[in-house]
Amino acid sequence: PKTLDLMDKPVIAMVNGVAVGAGMGMALQCDLRIASEEAKFSTGYVKVGLVPGDGDAFFLPRLVGIAKALELLWTGDFVEAREAERLGIVNKVVPAGDLRQYTGELARRIADGPQIAIRMMKRVAYQSLRLDVRTHLDLVSSHMAVVRETEDHKEGVQAFKEKRPPKFTGR
């Protein structure tokens, strides 16, 4: 869990099939999760008398709320892809044949964006889970001061004025 937690770049999970226990935990650690219609999820640990040790008990309540998370942890029930999407476990469900293409296109759209701002968005979004709103807004202001000085910001503003797509460089 620490490796993905420390990554400042967006991390996208692509789930095509069954994700149980550590497999589900690894997907939950990612920033976004895209699943095929055939995907199924289960924490599974209760079935073998274990406590989730890979982040399920940390990430799941943040995505689905404490009561639903406890239900899934205590029962080990499987959640089908569409229900996982409805609950917020996955961001999007697509046909199995489209999974790789859809996920690749999403990753490309994010990678083509202003990378300094995207990394800061990730940081402040996760930090907001531990902060009060006033502290969060102060943090966002300090990050805003940094990104306003980037070439990507200047390019974004210029592209907006010229009514064209921006060409970000990550600087």
Where are these regions (language model features)?
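Crotonase-fold acyl-CoA enzyme core
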Residues: 2-118, 145, 149-158, 164, ...
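A short structural micro-motif
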Residues: 127-128, 163-167
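Conserved "HGTGT" condensation-loop signature of ketosynthase/thiolase-family condensing enzymes
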Residues: 135
